[in-house]
Each structure stands twice: as C-alpha cells, then as structure tokens.
Amino acid sequence: MEYIPILILVISFIGLLAIGTPVAWSITISALLTMLVSIPALPAFTTVAQRIGTGLDSFALLAIPFFILSGELMNKGGIAHRLIAFAKTLVGALPGGLALINIISAMLMGAIAGSAMASASAMGSILGPEMEKEGYSKEFGAAVNITSATTGLLIPPSNVLIVYSLASGGASIAALFLAGYIPGILTGLFLMLVASFWARKKGYKVGKRSTFKNIIRTFIDAVPSLFMLVVVIGGIVTGIFTATEASAIAVLYSVVLGFIYKEITFGKLPQILLDSSATTAIVMLLIGASMSMSWAMSFENIPQDISTGLLSISDNKIIILLIINLLLLVVGIFMDMTPAVLIFTPIFLPVVIKLGLDPVHFGIIMILNLCIGLCTPPVGSVLFVGVGIANTTIEKVIKPLLPLFVVMIIALFLITYLPQLSLWLPGLFDL
C-alpha cells in the first residue's frame, strides 16, 4: 500500500478544516496537494478545475436544484403548520405529545421539503415556544427537533440519495427512494419511544384527545401537501418520469399549492428563488469539489489501497460492516453529508460489493451514519440550527441528546445487519 498520498490527503484536509477553511476549499486544495505527489503543478491545477466542471455535468444532478426550490416553496407555503396540526390530532394526547408531534411532523416535513435544516428550522420555530410553554425544557425540545429532522433525509424525495446514486455509479434512484422508507420510519419510531419515556419520567403535560371530526378535518387540510409524495415517488417508481422530471413537477405542484393556501404571493417569489439559488450554489460547489477529490483518490489508487487494507483485516461481513460504520460515524462528525457521500462511496462500495452487499442497502447504511453526524459537533449543521432556534447551547443539549443518539445507533445496526429492512420495498416493485 502506498501511504504517502493517503497521508497528504488526510493531513491536509483535517489541517485546513482546523484553521477554518471552508469545506469546499479544503476538499479542493487537499485533492490538488494529493495529485502533486505524482504529476507536475500545471497539469494538476488544470485537472482539478476540469474535474470540478465535469463532476457537475450530469442529468441526474438537475434534480437537486429543483428539489431545493420545491422544498423552499413548501417551507414558505404554510405546510409546516398543517402537518403539525394533523400530527397533533394523532399523538397530542400521548405522554410527550408535543415531542411526538415534532418527530412525526419532522419526518413528513423532511420528506416533502427534502431538507433536514429546513425541517429543524420550521419545527423549532413553531413547536419550540409551545413546548416551553407546556413545561418542556428547551434543551429537550431542541434535542428532539435536531434528531428527528434528519429522518426526513431517508424518507424520499431526498437529494442526498440522488447524490449517492451518482457516486455509486448508477444505483437505481427509484430503488433508493423506496429503500429509505422503512429505515426512516423505524428511526422515527425509536426516537418517539425515547421522547415518550423521557417526557413521562419528567412529568410533562399531556394534551387533550382529539375528536374524530378534528382528525378528519386536519387530515383533509394536510392531504394536498402529502399528495405531492404520491405524485413524485409514484411517478418515479412506475417509470412515468425520471427523478429529474419529478423534481420539476414538484416545483410546479409546490407553486400551485402555495397560491391555493394563500401563503405564497408573486411578491414573495423573488426572495424564494434567491434563497434556493444560494442553497443550490453551496451544494453544487461541494459536489464539484468532492468530484475532484474522488478523481484524485482514484488516480492515486487510494480506494483500492483502502479496500485491500480492510479486507486484509477480515473477510467477515459482520466485522467489516462494523468497521465501516465506525469510520462513517467519525466521518459524519467532521464532514458535511454531500462531500462525505461523494468521497467515501467510491472507497467503501467496492469493499461491501465484494462481501455480497447490495449497493442500495449500503446507500441507506451510509446515509443513516451521516444523519447521525449532522446532529454531532463540530460541524453538525442541523445541531447548530436546532440549538440556535431554541436559543440554548450545545453543552446543555448534550444530556437529552445522548439517549436519542443511542437509539439512532441501535436503528443503524438493525438496518445494517437486517438488509430486508431496506430491500423489501424495492423488491416488492422488482427494483
């Protein structure tokens, strides 16, 4: 194994992050320094620039800006209030009712908007003050909001699953979307169990039981928002349209729904477009930079070296998957999700394929690992959003966050070692 390129890549990347260099620049500079081991400066600079551009030259990636815009439209279109109202009628009378409402609403919001940060922001700003008024500690409310927001990244439509499809060399987007449902719901149920137990232990108030009439009324109010999932996912799975075409349909549906709800006006559209453009620019820069690093690693045979190293430790699937899970949990602590998927999929996927693992199953394992990282300092973006919305500190949130982390890790290992949790639904549709 050639250690020098790996050492240069790892040390330069961690060092750049440590001194506060933006992630995209850290990735690009690390890729460049790694390539300089083998080729002269001018070709190295030229190749990195080319790879950033060609890395974005993919029809599948067109879905990302459209889904981001759709999520922004849904977020500003009053969807969060309607989902919360519906969730409240279902679980509001149970112990920890408001926490359970947060989790269910976040799962639905994340699935529809496709953004954990949007979900954490919306749920935290709406439910946070209400939870505090009912006697919940704001630290517990923030912990529930932070962890539940990430479940929507597993429940489609999910931009990061599209990114994984690209990084894996063509894993079916439809299969990935279907594979995310059971793991996402299972993780949400585990979070609900912990939240309910914690609320019962602390003696938090229980809400009033809703009438059947009220359940039906709030459901009807939420149906137009939920129906978008049926249109988008149903269209992709049945082959009526591709994920990219589905994303454009989602934008059209979101605009029409926002006007019907009277939450979006023509005057608000420019700001919505500006916000979604800014988010898209960040995501696309990260994708381009990550593609340059992936190419640099392939050029230096780093994935093959790591694959050989892992398989030399053991050829036991259980042990190798345990090692990969631990590595991905560490990666999630220090790296944003999109670059992590693009950089580490080419490294670990060949290993798990040799062990007989399905690429779709591994995609769900990887995303759930990185979802846990989004809730973890030092770069957990959802953690910072949730703490900021709740007006508290990371140190105070850690205690209520720990039991939620534990059940997320339990869910991770169940999903890792019980592949049918991910593969049953795709198999049902012959995907």
Question: Which role does the model predict for each range below?
Answer:
Residues 1-431:
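Alpha-helical transmembrane segments of multi-pass membrane transport proteins
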